Amino acid sequence: MAVVGVGVDVVDVDRFAATLARTPGIAMRLFTATERGLARPERLAARFAAKEAVAKVLGAPPGLEWHDTEVVLGTGGRPSLRIIGTVAAAAARLGIASWHLSLTHDGGVAVAMVVAET
């Protein structure tokens, strides 16, 4: 396996929460129903950071759909990525076969780091 790309994104939790409160429809556009069920702003901010980090790994090609990247929790609560549709197609063009995700939120910021490998 070889690393194809690394993406990192940082989101200010309070600012993100204010955006969600000001524009309620944005959550529908950005998150899957499962993700929206996590309601706590720091969790949503971390998931948005993950989606941004994935886009950075892919070179942010036009046409990526936010819902095509979903953060899911595996055994023991470990986060991972579910990639479908436009994001899966962009990943296939780059030969990406596996994804690694790390999320954290502390001190008012949420951070996601994504590594993609062939």
From Swiss-Prot:
Q: What is its EC number?
A: 2.7.8.7
The record's Gene Ontology cellular component field reads: cytoplasm
Q: Does the keyword Transferase apply?
A: yes
Query: What does the record give as the reaction this protein catalyses?
Result: apo-[ACP] + CoA = holo-[ACP] + adenosine 3',5'-bisphosphate + H(+)
- The question of whether rRNA-binding is a record keyword is answered with no
**What Pfam families would the database entry show?**
ACPS
| List of residues binding Mg(2+) | D9, E52
Keyword annotations of the record:
Cytoplasm, Fatty acid biosynthesis, Fatty acid metabolism, Lipid biosynthesis, Lipid metabolism, Magnesium, Metal-binding, Transferase
Looking at its record, which EC class is this enzyme? Answer: transferase
Q: What's this protein's function?
A: Transfers the 4'-phosphopantetheine moiety from coenzyme A to a Ser of acyl-carrier-protein.
Q: What is this protein called?
A: Holo-[acyl-carrier-protein] synthase
The primary gene name is: acpS
